[in-house]
Amino acid sequence: MKRVLLLLLAVVCGHALERGRDYEKDKVCKELSTLGKDDFRTLSLVLYSRKFPSGTFDQVMKLVKEVVSLTEDCCTEDADPGCYDNRTSALSATSCESDSPFPVHPGTAECCTKEGLGRKLCMAALKHPPQEFPTYVEPANDEICEAFRQDPMEFADKFLYEYSSNYGQAPLPILVSYTKSYLSMVGTCCTSASPTVCFLKERLQIKHLSLLTTLSNRVCSQYAAYGKEKSRRSHLIKLAQKAPTAALKEVLPLAEDITNILSKCCESTSEDCMAKELPEHTVKICDTLSTKNPKFEECCQEKTPMDIFVCTYFMPAAQPPEPANVELPTSKDVCDSKNINVMDQYTFELSRKTHIPEVFLSKVLEPTLKSLSECCHSADSTACLNAKGPVLKKEVSSFIDKGQELCAGYSENTFTEYKKKLSQQLRAKLPEATSAELAELVEKHSDFASKCCSINSPPNYCDSEIDAEIKNLPEP
């Protein structure tokens, strides 16, 4: 499977590697022969659905059909030697046409300014940002079976497209394994004498794989949005907030461990990478943090490692042990090459003492830490930090205050209670507002809070939304 997936990734846009087109073509043809047309087509559909999540079903299917066709045609013994290269070149040319039948990527136009191999490599490298809000909703059992009985192949194709485009950040082997298991369940239960009983039994069998798929999609989406270093900081912030009585030396290795796991597993073609690494990580969490917060202790009583990880992942932040009054590090500390953890220490202290969602802290820490580091490259680092320090501290404090105002009460109440209290607060602030205006404001603020005021809020979406919401806050 590992080699197959790697080669299919190469096929996506005729990705001829430096070792040569003939070498690549031979590999692809061998895998087509090994897999067979149907499995090759299925994997291609999963890959393109992930790669082009904004493409329509018809667009993705046309691309799949074309790639499978050219691979079949060019892999026959009597195929023209230039068949593979010519057909993949024609495929990339068609992708550049204004009325292209294939899915479009925002970066396609730039790739189309290149020619030949450069264009193919450019298109092969295109990636969509993570789908931070999956919209796939599984139909009811009777709807599933009705669609399956009408056309089993079309049902399978549409499911593969919809699920893969929504959960495309899950590691490819996990995504393939789950979708294959799901379709097997549908085929079994929709031909069963007791479909309802069958679905209950089969869903229980694939529950672990389903959970692994959706959760790995979520953590890998955040990793893709942040990148390795920001992801590391993000996990440090979350752990500091969940275990504010722990020490940096206890939470930093855990933040680095989960970041390394995501770095290794999110793009891995190994079928058991995530399934093997996450349980080992949960053991480290429980060994280190179960005495730091009763909620960690509760989570560590769950039956399976995956259940433990889910419990700790969704655990809310604890109440800070003391009010936030964190001093910026000095120029001596910041610029001392031996003091490698000074930025982490500042991040840790600010996070554990601040009751504000991680996306807010990550957003304000990025420019703050960058400004501190820049002082080390100035002619007089001490003077630089003395000048910037008070301004940075004021900006951080102001941003945190605004973030706390935007998310006040969200994590402490049910959503219904939160909206009720929000309505009362807005009514007190805006006594002249009409009922309709008030209702609109409540919906707007509560929608923002539901997406950006939790500990695992999506960074890409919330980055711009936070700016917009803060801009609309009245000046004190």
From Swiss-Prot:
Involved in vitamin D transport and storage, scavenging of extracellular G-actin, enhancement of the chemotactic activity of C5 alpha for neutrophils in inflammation and macrophage activation. Associates with membrane-bound immunoglobulin on the surface of B-lymphocytes and with IgG Fc receptor on the membranes of T-lymphocytes. Interacts with LRP2; the interaction is required for renal uptake of GC in complex with 25-hydroxyvitamin D3. Residues 1-16 form the signal peptide. The keyword Repeat applies. SUPFAM superfamilies: Serum albumin-like. One of its GO terms (molecular function) is actin binding. It holds the Pfam family VitD-bind_III. It is found in: Secreted. Disulfide bonds join C29-C75, C74-C83, C96-C112, C111-C122, C145-C190, C189-C198, C220-C266, C265-C273, C286-C300, C299-C311, C335-C376, C375-C384, C407-C453, C452-C462. Belongs to the ALB/AFP/VDB family. Its main location: secreted. Residues 17-208, 209-394, 395-476 form the Albumin domain. GO terms for cellular component: blood microparticle; cytoplasm. It comes from Oryctolagus cuniculus. Glycans are attached at N86. It comes from the Eukaryota. This is Vitamin D-binding protein. Keywords: Actin-binding, Disulfide bond, Glycoprotein, Repeat, Secreted, Signal, Transport, Vitamin D.
